[in-house]
A protein has these predicted regions:
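N-terminal pre-triad scaffold of radical SAM enzymes
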Residues: 14-53, 58-82, 135
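Hydrophobic faces of well-ordered beta-strands that scaffold small-molecule active sites
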Residues: 29-33, 81-83, 114-118, 137-139, ...
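Auxiliary Fe-S-binding modules of radical SAM enzymes
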Residues: 1-6, 67, 200-321
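Glycine-rich, proline-tolerant flexible connector loops at the mouths of alpha/beta enzymes
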Residues: 32-35, 82-95, 147-149, 209-221, ...
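Glycine-enriched alpha-helix->loop->beta-strand junction motifs that scaffold or abut catalytic
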Residues: 130-137, 171-173, 199-203, 262-268
Length: 321
């Protein structure tokens, strides 16, 4: 189905994906608040705007700022707080305790589950995250083609990255896996990745279309076609009907939400409060300061589609299954 171009077949694929989602989740869609709290990174990924060698303005939020933003997101109605950072050596090597303290405070103050996306961390750090009760560990392989991985994630170890998420799962954390499209992969690579996501037991699986980043070696690539992304979302839904599958606001902003939900996604990610001094990842500024990535905006679109934002209790009930 990924390579078929008949519009009628594609619409039937999306229709089946929506029915599969409805069977498990009724008309409820989950909402994730996004706090990208440090854009410093030791890595030099060829696809990333925040790669180490890119001469850009960066920020690192204080623990107090992170907690305040998380509280504001919780009050706005999100179901989870997603804490994301680059592989910032300040936190990775010097003060990982600060990350743990922030997670503990957010859980206590908001009562919401937390997802941490810190890049590759040590087994000991994963154990400490798990002991704290951190629900999710997000770490994307981007591709499961090792040769392509080496071109995307320069001088990084495929097995080390895979080990981290498997170890997190072994320690009782839920795992999110993700891939990029439009970076030189084949349809066979995509199919392999979808299968691998199931093999590693990922409870949340995502795909994102590549957006060329200024100052990166892949700046000259063409922006990936979101139709392929939506087809992959639909196939993932049919393969893993009870999985969490995001529709990210980080690719096409709020205007791209409806198409991804129509393809079978059941999570809206990258909800960012305006005027908090935060960036997105693939589209670092799109819709952020204008308030286009808020619960209010996303909820209005869902209701227009006959869907409803899930409550915090409904999300916790899902996690307990």
């Amino acid at each position: 189905m990924l390579g078929r171009e008949d519009p009628a077949e594609t619409e039937e694929l999306f229709n089946r994906a929506r029915k599969a989602r409805e069977a498990f989740f009724s008309n409820r869609i989950f909402l994730y608040g996004f706090v990208y709290f440090s854009t410093w990174c030791r890595n030099d990924c060829n696809f990333c705007y925040f790669r180490r060698s890119n001469k850009i303005e960066r920020y690192r939020k204080t623990p107090e700022e992170i907690i305040a933003i998380a509280e504001a997101l919780a009050k706005s109605g999100v179901n989870l707080i997603d804490l994301t950072m680059g592989e910032d050596l300040r936190f990775h090597r010097e003060d990982f305790d600060a990350v743990l303290r922030v997670i503990k405070a957010i859980k206590e103050l908001t009562g919401l589950p937390v997802m941490i996306s810190p890049g590759v961390v040590t087994d000991d750090q994963i154990e400490r995250l798990a002991e704290l009760g951190t629900e999710w560990y997000a770490l994307y392989q981007e591709t499961h083609n090792r040769e392509l991985f080496s071109r995307l994630r320069v001088n990084q170890d495929y097995d080390e990255r895979m080990h981290a998420k498997l170890y997190a799962r072994e320690k009782g954390m839920l795992v999110e896996e993700g891939i990029l499209t439009g970076v030189g992969e084949s349809l066979a690579d995509i199919a392999d990745s979808i299968l691998e996501m199931g093999r590693i037991g990922a409870r949340q699986v995502r795909v994102m279309s590549f957006v060329p980043q200024p100052g990166s070696p892949m700046e000259g690539f063409k922006k990936a076609d979101s139709l392929l992304e939506r087809k992959i979302i639909a196939v993932m839904r049919l393969m893993y009907p009870d999985a969490l599958i995001p529709a990210s606001l980080d690719i096409d902003g709020i205007k791209g939400l409806e198409g991804r939900i129509d393809a079978g996604a059941n999570v809206i990610t990258s909800i960012i409060p305006p005027r908090a001094g935060l960036a997105g990842v693939a589209q670092s500024t799109m819709d952020v300061e204008e308030g286009g990535r808020t619960v209010e905006e996303a909820s209005a679109i869902l209701r227009k589609m006959g869907l409803q934002p899930a409550s915090a209790e409904e999300y916790k009930e899902y996690l307990s299954r």
